[in-house]
Amino acid sequence: RDVMSEVAYMQSPITKIEPQIAAKLSKQRYHLVGEHGGVKVCHWTKEELKNDRHCYKGTFYGIQSSGCMQMAPNVDTCNLACTYCWREPHSETMTKIDDDPEMLFYESVRAHRRLLTGFKGHKDVSIEKWEEAQNPKHVAISLNGEPTLYSRLAEFLEICHDHGVSTFLVTNGSLPRTIERLDTLPTQLYVSVDAPNKEIFNKLCKPKFNSNSWEQLEKTLELLPSLDTRTVCRHTLIKNHSLGYHEDYARLDNLADPDFIEAKGYVYVGHSQNNHTISDMPSHAEVMEFSRTLAPMVGREVLADRSESRVTLIGKEIIPVTLPEQKRMLPKDLGI
């Protein structure tokens, strides 16, 4: 298949993503779904299929990586321009994203299956594991873009849960009213708290449309204790920029009182290489040192870590994720 037909194959017939962005995403093995959505197979999904190695979510939360689908309802829109984001730059305009949530879920599963086709018959992949992967058990809504900009997010979460699929939603926390209004909450809500204070936030996270984004993030953190779901504050730590500042991070974490805190070292990959240097990557030892200092300041301890991902889990106890009760089956004729 030549490059242009490959790109066309990976594009949704109804996509409204700008052609230049769509072509870049397709070249990076995204399958575009709906008007603004996209799916991409995670590195760790492939690792578990081939080598029985799961990602840190397996260690921390009991997630089976081969059963995880990585997607986003809006891969092309974000209201921040974070310097450390490894994804492609997003559209400079904010269009309303209102894809039908059932269509988005089914098309995402179909795209995920298409992307896994090449693993069938691979010498290192058991047919049983490949068949299990055809029906995802977990959806990581974390691929690209800011998912709380999707106007039908609560309906999408409900449809996932009705199919017995857990949801992991990663948000930058800049839209607290949207989170507050969600009728259905994700199985686990991650809030990216990637700067210790407003000055560093504005330098690293670069709000595109709202100069009060830091204050909005603080409102989201204040909201977390009232939400009836699992919550996580995630700190992406950039050496020479945001690593350290334990007292500032402790203030934010104590405000949010999350079930878990993840401290993760910045990785010098993708688009972020335009803004950072390899010396901005902390070692796993430095992430561990940060975590051991922070943990007692928030009444928690370091529960686990994964050196290859430079990440630690801070909390009170490890509690594995449980799947929602399945009320609906995927259509038998869903196909790819």
What is each PLM-predicted segment?
Residues 122-285, 289, 293:
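Conserved AdoMet/S-adenosylmethionine-binding subsite of the radical SAM
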